[in-house]
């Protein structure tokens, strides 16, 4: 059965983006919403990028909450998982790591009546827009912008500071050993 056969013309779905710096609770918020839909018996499928090797086959928050996720290399792989079963909600964690194809995939799912919720970093460690998150924010029906707490002063943190100097590459998979939340005042410029 093809993708288009599974999804007939449906009313348009909604798109929600959860964004903010590291340690702001993006994955926790995503998992909270997923749990609510599952309790209401709404079919949900969760995807994450394979490049994020911190928790294989899981979307897991720092609070210890988790749910099973399908690891994919390309956003186009999402279509392969939607040909057999109908899902009302597609959840995508760490979306900043996907190619720009993620925007077209989210739009096409939305046009087919599938609700899509995406979480990811909106800026990198240089406070520059990260990946395709800005384009996803532009098409979102709802945006949940979260803050962390600055590790230096305790004020609201909107930025992620890389605290290791391995490279200037934008993508360096890590956690508390490599990054910490910072307010605008306490984030030095570029890396």
Curated annotation (Swiss-Prot):
UniProt keywords (A-Z) are:
ATP-binding, Cytoplasm, DNA synthesis, Kinase, Metal-binding, Nucleotide-binding, Transferase, Zinc
Q: Tell me the active site.
A: 94
- The answer to whether the entry has keyword Membrane is no
Transferase in keyword set: yes
Q: What is its EC number?
A: 2.7.1.21
What domain of life? Answer: Bacteria
**SUPFAM superfamilies (UniProt xref):** Glucocorticoid receptor-like (DNA-binding domain), P-loop containing nucleoside triphosphate hydrolases
| Catalysis performed (reactions) | thymidine + ATP = dTMP + ADP + H(+)
> Which Gene Ontology cellular component terms are annotated?
cytosol
The record lists ATP as bound by 20-27, 93-96
Q: Which InterPro entries match?
A: P-loop_NTPase, Thymidine_kinase
Main location class: cytoplasm
Give GO BP annotations, semicolon-separated.
DNA biosynthetic process; thymidine metabolic process
Q: What's a Gene Ontology MF term here?
A: ATP binding
Family the entry assigns: Belongs to the thymidine kinase family.
How it assembles, according to the record, is: Homotetramer.
Q: Which HAMAP family match?
A: Thymidine_kinase (MF_00124)
This chain's protein is named Thymidine kinase
Gene name of the encoded protein: tdk
